[in-house]
């Protein structure tokens, strides 16, 4: 397995966070296909060319393991350092057209949307994630609660990450997506076991009344390419 070093990942993360006057973006394409292996093989091979053509920071694929909105869904994601970078791209520039022409897998594009990245984490080669779609009337209070929860989880030895996105287009506009993850599935599972503990429930109770959980799902993600730093 090709390993993405923590140093490189850290540089990518710091690059995202350094844009004080910019807003990082995730472009997310939801694809439905019966040939998951074929689609993943194409994405892995084409990703280095696609991120270069689109000025993306990174690109990869996530596949639900439970809770998928539709069986056969997969999520092709790209990270951009700013809205400006994301918007200046032609979705079907010559390189994209050329690479898509190589894809011989039957598939349906169910959605193609942008998500604001409001909490970033270092990237890993592969990871396991528990995601929630949440509606909230107070994003700042909710983010503060999530920050407290992540800090306490880590303080108690749970080596997890917590990415947070806000939908910017499509039916998920304004929806918050929380993605708690780990490089090891058992590590993520242990962190989820902590939900039964008093300290966890106390932290969640501080923001539970300000949110409505819409949908939950689990997935496995792979990073296929990162821009040179």
Label each region the model flagged.
Residues 21-229:
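Short S/T/G/P-rich N-terminal loop/turn motif that feeds into the first structured element of a domain
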Residues 15-19:
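N-terminal signal peptide c-region/cleavage motif recognized by signal peptidases
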Residues 1-11:
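Bacterial N-terminal signal peptides that target proteins for export
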């Amino acid at each position: 397995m090709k390993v993405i070093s923590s140093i490189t990942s850290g540089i990518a993360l710091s690059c995202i966070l350094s844009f004080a006057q910019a807003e990082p973006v995730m472009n997310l394409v939801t694809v439905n296909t019966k040939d998951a292996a074929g689609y993943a093989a194409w994405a892995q091979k084409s990703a280095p060319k696609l991120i270069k053509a689109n000025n993306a920071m990174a690109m990869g694929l996530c596949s639900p393991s439970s809770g998928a909105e539709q069986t056969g869904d997969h999520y092709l994601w790209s990270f951009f350092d700013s809205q400006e970078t994301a918007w200046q791209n032609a979705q079907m520039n010559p390189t994209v057209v050329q690479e898509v022409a190589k894809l011989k897998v039957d598939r349906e594009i169910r959605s193609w949307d942008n998500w604001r990245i409001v909490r970033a984490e270092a990237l890993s080669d592969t990871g396991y994630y528990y995601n929630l779609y949440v509606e909230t009337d107070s994003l700042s209070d909710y983010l503060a609660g999530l920050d407290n929860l992540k800090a306490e989880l880590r303080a108690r030895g749970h080596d997890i990450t917590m990415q947070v996105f806000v939908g910017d287009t499509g039916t998920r506009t304004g929806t918050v997506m929380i993605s708690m993850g780990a490089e090891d599935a058992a590590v993520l599972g242990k962190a989820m076991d902590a939900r039964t503990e008093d300290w966890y429930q106390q932290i969640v109770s501080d923001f539970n009344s300000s949110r409505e959980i819409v949908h939950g799902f689990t997935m496995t993600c792979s990073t296929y390419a990162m821009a040179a730093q």
